[in-house]
Amino acid sequence: MTKVFCKKYHQELDAIPFQPLPGELGKKIHNEISNKAWQAWLAHQTILINEYRLNLIEPKAKEFLKEEMHKFLFEGKEEKPEQFSEI
């Protein structure tokens, strides 16, 4: 499997096997983010969608997730909603 130096985990890990999003952002993620980090983002995204009851049809919800994705993957910020608790 192809390796990538992951910006989130600061180490060489398995790359995402496909470009996860279209456009330049998708290319950047594919080139700089590991599959491990991408899977962690998908889990975190699910928490955000459920806890904030986001409607993904709404542009504001999509923009919010895009901003949170950038923070999570490239800035190392992983903020869970206040009301969230692990089971």
Swiss-Prot record:
GO terms for biological process: cellular response to oxidative stress. It comes from the Bacteria. It holds the Pfam family Iron_traffic. Keywords: Iron. One of its GO terms (cellular component) is cytosol. GO terms for molecular function: iron ion binding. Belongs to the Fe(2+)-trafficking protein family. Could be a mediator in iron transactions between iron acquisition and iron-requiring processes, such as synthesis and/or repair of Fe-S clusters in biosynthetic enzymes. HAMAP family: Fe_traffic_YggX. This is Probable Fe(2+)-trafficking protein.
